[in-house]
Amino acid sequence: MSIAIPLGVDTTETSYLEMAAGSEPESVEASPVVVEKSNSFPHQLYTSSSHHSHSYIGLPYADHNYGARPPPTPPASPPPSGLISKNEVGIFTTPNFDETSSATTISTSEDGSYGTDVTRCICGFTHDDGYMICCDKCSVWQHIDCMGIDRQHIPDTYLCERCQPRSLDKERAVLLQRRKRENMSDGDTSATESGDEVPVELYTAFQHTPTSITLTASRVPKVTDKRRKKSGEKEQNFSKCKKAFREGSRKSSRVKGSAPEIDPSSDSSNFVWETKIKAWMDRYEEANNNQYSEGVQREAQRLAQRLGSGNDSKDMNKSELSTNNSLFRPPVESHIQKNKKILKSAKDLPPDALIIEYRGKFMLREQFEANGYFFKRPYPFVLFYSKFHGLEMCVDARTFGNEARFIRRSCTPNAEVRHEIEEGTIHLYIYSIQSIPKGTEITIAFDFDYGNCKYKVDCACLKENPECPVLKRSSESTENINSGYETRRKKGKKEKDTSKEKDIQNQNMTLDCEGTNNKIRSPETKQRKLSPLRLSVSNNQEPDFIDDMEEKTPISNEVEMESEEQIAERKRKMTREERKMEAILQAFARLEKREKRREQALERISTAKTEVKPECKESQVIADAEVVQEQVKEETAIKPAAAKVNRTKQRKSFSRSRTHIGQQRRRHRTVSMCSDIPPSSPDIEVLSQQNEIENTVLAIEPETETAVAEIIPEAEVPALNKCPTKYPKTKKHLVNEWLSEKNEKTGKPSDSLSERPLRITTDPEVLATQLNSLPGLTYSPHVYSTPKHYIRFTSPFLSEKKRRKETTENISGSCKKRWLKQALEEENSTILHRYHSPCQERSRSPTVNGENKSPLLLSDSCSLPDLTTPLKKRRLYQLLDTAYSESSTPTPSPYATPTHTDITPTDPAFATPPRIKSDDETYRNGYKPIYSPVTPVTPGTPGNTMHFENISSPESSPEIKRCTYNQEGYDRPSNMLTLGPFRNSNLTELGLQEIKTIGYTSPRSRTEVNRPCPGEKESVSDLQLGLDAVEPAALQKSMETPAHDRTEPSNQLDSTHSGRGTMYSSWVKSPDRTGVNFSVNSNLRDLTPSHQLETGGGFRVSESKCLIQQDDTRGMFLGAAVFCTSEDGLASGFGRTVNDNLIDGSCTPQNPPQKKKVSLLEYRKRQREARKSGSKPENFALISVSPHPSGSLSSSGDGCVHSSENGEQAENQASLPLPPPAAAAAATAAAAYSASSEEGSSNCPVKDANSSEKKDPEVQWTASTSVEQVRERSYQRALLLSDHRKDKDSGGESPCVSCSPSHVQSPPSSHSNHIPQVHAQSLAPSLSELMADPDAEGTEATSTSECPSPDTSQSPSKTSKPGSPGPINPAQSHGKILTKPDSHWEATATVSEADNSVHQNPEPQHRQLSSNTPALSQNHAPQAHALSANDQLPQKLPSAPTKLHCPPSPHTENPPKSSTPHTPVQHGYLSPKPPSQHLGSPFRPHHSQSPQVGTPQRETQRNFYAAAQNLQANPQQATSGALFTQTPSGQSSATYSQFNQQSLNSTAPPPPPPPPPSSYYQNQQPSANFQNYNQLKGSLSQQTVFTSGPNQALPGSTSQQSVPGHHVTPGHFLPSQNPTIHHQPAAAAVVPPPPPPPPAPGPHLIQQPSSHQQHSVAHGVGPVHAVTPGSHIHSQTAGHHLPPPPPPPGPAPHHHPPPHPTTGLQSLQAQHQHVVNSAPPPPPPPPPPPPASVLVSGHHSASGQALHHPPHQGPPLFPASAHPAVPPYPSQATHHTTLGPGPQHQPSGTGPHCPLPVAGPHLQPQGPNSIPTPTASGFCPHPHPGSVALPHGVQGPQQASPVPAQIPIHRAQVPPTFQNNYHGSGWH
C-alpha cells in the first residue's frame, strides 16, 4: 500500500496504485507503465486485449482501461491504467469504464492484501458507486444496489450472481447505475464522474506540467495517506457491511469522482480534494484589492478609454459599495459541503443585489491558459469573464482572492458576474439575478465551456435539475470516454492546450500528489522496464503514443485533480473508488514516469536503445494479447535488468512507445495489409526510428550501418511520408497536427510528450549529440528541421529506439525500426537474404527504402534485397564501394538506366521507374514516392536505393511500391528514387542500370551524400565544404572518382556524413558517383538528376518528393525530380536540391547515414551554421522532414547538395566560388533553411501533403513495366490533370508540376553540366528512342509521371495546359516527369541537353569547368568534378555520367533539344509527347542526348518538341541552335533559349499533348538550361567552373561568367549578391537575362524558386506557379531569392510579396513551404515555374534557371545574355541551389529563403517585386526578367528586355497555362 500510495499521484493515489497495481506490485509497476504508455489504452493496459482498443501490450495508459475491460489477469490490466484511460476511454468515468470494462474492473484493495479487485456487475458498469460489495468466493466487486442488496442489511457472506446464481433485475441495475453515473458528479457517485474528470485533469496536469506534476507528486503521498484514511473511514461509514465496503480492500479508485464535484466550481469551485481544497480554502491570501496583469490593465484601459465609463456609472455605484469592503459586508458566508466550500447567502437577497466582489489576480485568459491553467482543468478558484467588451479575462483566486472564490457554477445560477470600472481598473462583482433566500448557495453560470472540459464538471445544482446539461454532458462524456476514446484522445490533444490551465491547477493538486507521483514512478519505472516490449509494440504508434502521452498527461492531471476530490469522495467510499483513484494516481505517475522515461529514453536510446529495441521486437513478436500480458510480466522481469534511471528513461520512451504499442501493432497490421505503409502513421515514429537507426547506424559498424541504412530508408521514407496519402490521418497527420499544435503550444503538450526528450535534448547541439547517440535521431532531417517538435514528436529516440532494437535484432543491431520490423516481419527472410546477399544487398540498398516496409519492394526480384538494402543502404553503399566501387552494374542497376544506351526508352524497367503506374500514382498520392522510381535521387538514401530498386524493377509492382511508397510517403520517395533506378537495374537494366545506377546511384548516393547533408548536412556541408573547399580535389576526386571512389569518400563521407556515403551507396558504385559526389553540391545534384532522370523511376521517387516539395526538388534529380532539377535550372541547384531532398527528404535514409557520420550535435551545429550561413543543411533536415522541405531541399538539394556542399560549402564554401554561390545561396538558404528547416518541420506536413499529391502522379512513373501504359495513362491523366491543374495551377496547383519540371530542368542544367554529357550520350539514344517510342511512352510516362504529379503537378500543368499540353507535361513533367519517365526522361533529356551542352561545349564547359574547376573545385569540388565528370561524363557518360547525367542528360538533351525545344520543352511540355519522349528518352535515351548533345538532343528535343511543338521547336531550335551553339554555357543558354523558345513556342505547343513531356521536358529543358544552369549550378556547384567556361563561352557565358563570379556569388553570390538576390547576384551577373525568361516562366520561375524552393515549392509552388502568383510567391518566397521568383511572375502575386520573399522569404518560404506544400498542386504547373523555381527556387539557381530560361526563352533575345543569364541562373541555380536550398529550403524552411532573403530580399524585393510584377504579368513576369533581372540583378534587366520580348512571346505562346505554368517550369 505504501508503494501504492507513493505511486498514486492523486490524492487517491493509493487507490489508484492499488487499482493499477492490482494486488501485485509487479502489476502495479506494469500498470503504471501501461498507463503511462498508451494514451488511450488503459484497457489495453489492463490487458493487451483491453477491450477498448487495440491491444497495446505496454499500453501505459491504464486509465483508458478504466473504460476498457480489465484484462483477466490483474497484472495484464492494472486498474490504474484503466483509471488513467478514463480520459481516453473514460478511465475515470466509472460509467465509461464500467461500460467499457463491461463491469469488470480490476482494482486493488487498500489493505495490503488488495489483490486485483475486479468489478463485474450485472449493470455492466465498472464504476465504483460508493456502495459495492465483494463476492467472498470470487472476490469480484459489485454494486450493492444493482445486486438488490439492502444497504441497511448487507449479508455477512456475499456471493455474486455467478457464484450463487439467482435472478437479478439487470435492467433496473443498469438504469440505476446509469443514473448514478450521471449523478456521480454530485460526489456520491463522483467516483465515476471524477473518473471522467480526473483523467483529463490528470492528463492535463501531467501533460502540461509533467515536471510540476513530478514536483507536486511529493506532496501527494501524505495527502493520499490522509485521504485514504479518511476514505477508509468514509467507506466504513458508507458500507454497513465490511464486505460491501472494504475500507482497506477497495479504495475506490473512482474516488476521484469527487473531482467532478470540484469541477463544477472549477473556476471558483471548491474541489472536493480534501487536502487541496482545504488547503485552498484555508490557504489563500485574502484579497482586499485586485492584482492586475499588465495585459488586463492595458486592455481594460484601452477599452475604458475607447468606451468611456459607460459601465462605470452603475458599476461605480456598486463598486463603491464593494470597494469599501469595510462598509460593505458581503451578505454571504462560506460553508463547507462535501469537502467543498460553497458560498451561501447570509440573508435573503433581492434580485440585482450586490453580493460580493470577486477578487484575485486579474489576467487575460490567454495568459492564464498560457500558464497552463485552463478551464479544461477544474481549477478551483478561477473566474473567467468575457463580458467586458469581449475582453477574455479571468480572475485567479486560487492563492489570492476572497470568499467569492468559493462560488460554484451551476446550470441554474442565481447570481451573475458583472464588471465595473473603478479608477481605471476593472472589478468583477457578483450580483444576484433573482431573489436568493437565506442559506441558499450562491451560484453563477458556467464561465467556461464545461462541455470541453475533460474532467467531470460538477454542477452546483447537485442533480436537482434533471435537465442539467452539465450532468448530461458529464454522463455523456463518461460514456463517450469509453466509446469515444479515440475522439477523446484527439480531443485530449486539443484539451491538452486547454488542459494546461487545469494542469496548473492540477499542478497544485499534483503537488499534493507529488510524493505519490514519485512513488508511483518507481513502479512506473519498473513498468518502463516492461516498456521495451511495449516499446516495440508502440514503435509503430509513436505519433499516437505522443498523442496518448499528451492525453494521458491530461488524464493524469485530471486523475490528480480528481484524486483530491476522490479523497473527499473516498472518505465516503474509500473502497473501490479509492483503489481506483490510486490506480489513477499510479497511472498518472506512470505518465510522469513515461515522460521521464521518454527523457531518459533520449539519453538511454543511444545506450539502451539497442537493448530495449530487441526487447521490443520480442514483445512485438509476442501475440498482441500475449505480448501485453507477457510484456507486462516480461517488463516486470526485465525491470530489474534495466537501471532504474534507464528504466525511467526507458519508461518514458517506452511509455511513448507503449502508447504506440497498440498503434504500432495496428500499424504493423495496417502496414501488412496496406503493403507496409504504416510508417505513414508511424511517420514520426518512422522518422524517429530512422533517426534512431541512423544514430544506431552511426554507432554501428559500417556493415551494421549498412544494415541500418537499409532499414533507415524505409523508416525514413515513412517519415517523409508524413504527408502520405495512405496514412494521412494516422501518424503523419496526427503528428503534423501534433507538431503544429506543439508549435502553437510551443511545447506545452510537446513538453509533456517531447518536452522531456526535448528537455533532454532541447539544445540542438545537445539534441544532436543525443540524437547521434540515439540511433533514431541519427538523421537530422526531422530532428534538425524540427529538432524539438519533431524530435520529441517523432521521439526518434523512442520510436527509432524501439524500431532499431527490433530491427537490429532482426536484421542487424541497427535495424530496429518499426517499418523495418514490418518489412522484416512481412519479408523477414527475403529482406534478410537480400540483406545478406551482396548482390541483393546492392539491390537491397535501393530496396531498403520501400522494401523494408513493403513486400512490394520485396516483390521486386532484386527489390527484396534492395528493399533491405536501403536499410543497408550504407551496406549497399559499402558494397557499392567495394563491389560497385567503380560502377558495378548489378546493384547500381537502378542507375543502370543512366546507361541510356543499355536501357532503351522501351526498357520497361527503365520506363517503369519513370512512371509508376496509376498504382504508383496512388503512391504518389498516398506516397508521392510515385516518383519513387525517380527516387533514384534518393539513392543517396540507403532506403532510397532500395526503393529505387523496387521502383526500377518491374517486380516491384507499382502497386506494391505504391503501397510501400504510400506507406513510406516521403521517406519512401527517396527510397523509391533509389529504388527506381535500382529496380530498373533489377529489372532488365541491371547492367544498364548499373551504369545508370552509378549515374543515378551516384546522384542518388550523391543525393544521399547530400542527403546526409540534411541529416548530416552540417557534417556533409562541412565535409562537403571541406571537400569542396578544403578538398576540392578530394571532392573532385571523390566526385570524379568512379562511384566507388566517390563511394569510399562518400562512404566515409556517408559514414562520416551518412548521407554522402550512403547516397553513394546506391549509386556511388559508378564513377558518375564521383560526378555526383563532386556534384554533391552541384554535381551530386546533377548526378542525382541524371541518375534520377536516368532511372526515371528513381528520379520519380525523388520527384515524388520533389513533386511534393522535395519531390519537386528531388524531382529535378529524379525523373520527375529532374524537372526539379531542370527547373532548378541548377542541376546542381536542383540536383543538389534533389540530392538534398534525397539527403534530406528523398534521401532521408541517407540523411540518417550522414547523421550517423556526423554527430547529431555536429550535424545540428552544422545545420545551425548552415542556417546561419544560409546553407541548406537545415533544409536537408527540412526536406527530410517534409517533402516540401524536400522540395526545399530540392532547391536545397541543389542547394543542399549545394547546401550540403554548397550549404556547408556555403558555410565553409561561402568562400568557394561556385559553392559560394551555393554557399551564399546555401548560406542564405541554410539560413533560410534553418528557418526553412524549422519551417520545413511545420511545412513538412504540407509538403508531405504535397508529396502525397505529387507522389500519386509519381507513382505512375513507378510502374516499371507498364511505364508506357502508365505513361500513356498518366500522360493523359496528366493532360487532363494538367488542364485542370493548370487552371488550378493558376489557382496554385500547377506550380508543383511547374516546379518539378523546372526543377527537373534545373538539376539537369546542373546535372547537365556534369551529367549532360552522360545524358547527352545516354540521352541521345534514349531520347531518340523516347522520342520515337518514349515520345508516346516517355510522354506517356512523363504524362503519367506528370499525371500523378500533375495531380499535384500535372494539374497545374494541365491547368496551364488547357491551352498547352506543355504545361501538362511541365506539370506532368514536373509531377510526372519528375515522377519518373518524364522526370527521368526529362532529367535525362535535360541532362542530355546539358550533356549535349556539355558535350557540345564539353570543352567550353570543360574549359569552364577547367577554368571554373578551380572555382568549382573550390566551390564545388564536386561541381568541378561534375564538370569534369561532365567532361568525363562524355567518357563516363556511358557509365556514371550517363546514369547521373543521363537523367539530366535527357534533361539537358531535352534542354538542348529543349534548348530549342526548351521552349518546346515547355512547348514539349505543352506537347507532352515530345517532351515525354525526351523525358522518356532521357531515361533510357540518355544516350540519345549524348549523341546529339547540342543538336541531336535538341533535335530529339526538338523532335520531341517538334513532334508536339514543331514550330516552337524550330524557332527554339534555331534559337537553340544559337543558344545551344552558344553553350557550353550556351547550351544551357541554348537550352534556355530553346527552352525559352520552347516556352515561347510552347505557347503554341501548349495544346499538344507533349506538354507533359514538354513540361517534363521543359523541366528538363530547364534542366538543360538548368543543366547549363545546373552546370551553372554546377558552376555554382559545378558550374562555377562551368560558369567560367561554358557560361563564359556561352553567350550565357557572360551571364554565366557573372555566374562564375556569381557562382562564387551564388554561393557567394548569395553572400555578395545574396542580399540582393542571392540568386540575383549570381543571376545578377549572368542571371539577369535568364531571370527574364524565368519571368516568362514566371510561375515556373517562381516555381523554380518554388521548384527549388518548392521544388519543393516547385512542387508545391510549382502549382503555385500555376497559381503563379501564389506559386510565384512561393517560388519567390521559395525562390524569391530568385528574384527569378520571376516565377513570381506567375506566383509573383504569391511571390508577390516580394517583401514576402524578402520578409517573407522565410515567411514565404514557410509559406512557400506551406504553399508549396499546400500549393503542391499548384506547383505542378510551376513545372514551368520550376525554372522559376530554378531561378527562384533553383533557388535562384532554379530561379536563375527559370529566369535563365526566360533569357533562354529569349535566347535569341539574349542568347549570350540569355545564356549567360542561364549560366547566371545556373549560377543562380547554384545560387538557387544555395538559394535553391533556400528557396527549396525556403519552402522547406525559411532558411534558404532566408538566405534568399538576403539575396532574396534584394532578390525578392527586386525579384519578388519585380517578379510579382512579372508574375502579375503572368509569365511576363518572366519578362519580369526585370523582376528576374532584378533578382538576377544585372542580367535580370537584360533578361528582362529579352525575356519580356521573349517571354511575352512565351507568354503569347505558352501564355495560358504554359507560360505561367510552363514557362516557369515547362519552359524554364
Swiss-Prot record:
Biased composition (Low complexity): 884-908, 1184-1197, 1294-1312, 1348-1363, 1506-1518
Comp. bias regions, Pro residues: 1548-1558, 1631-1642, 1682-1692, 1719-1732
Disulfide bond entries: none
Annotated zinc fingers (PHD-type), start-end: 118-166
GO molecular function: enzyme binding; histone H3K4 methyltransferase activity; methylated histone binding; transcription coactivator activity; zinc ion binding
Segments forming domain SET: 330-447
Post-translational modification: Ubiquitinated. Deubiquitinated by USP7.
Chief location of this protein within or outside the cell: nucleus
Keyword Cell inner membrane: no
Glycan attachment residues as annotated in the record: S435, T440
Keyword Lyase: no
Residues with PTM Phosphoserine: S837, S845, S1070, S1282, S1364
Domain notes: The PHD-type domain binds specifically histone H3 tri-methylated at 'Lys-4' (H3K4me3), thus promoting binding to chromatin. The SET domain does not bind the methyl group donor S-adenosyl-L-methionine and histone 3 H3K4 peptide as a large loop prevents the docking of the 'Lys-4' side chain.
Name of the protein described by the UniProt record: Inactive histone-lysine N-methyltransferase 2E
Organism: Mus musculus
Gene this protein is translated from: Kmt2e
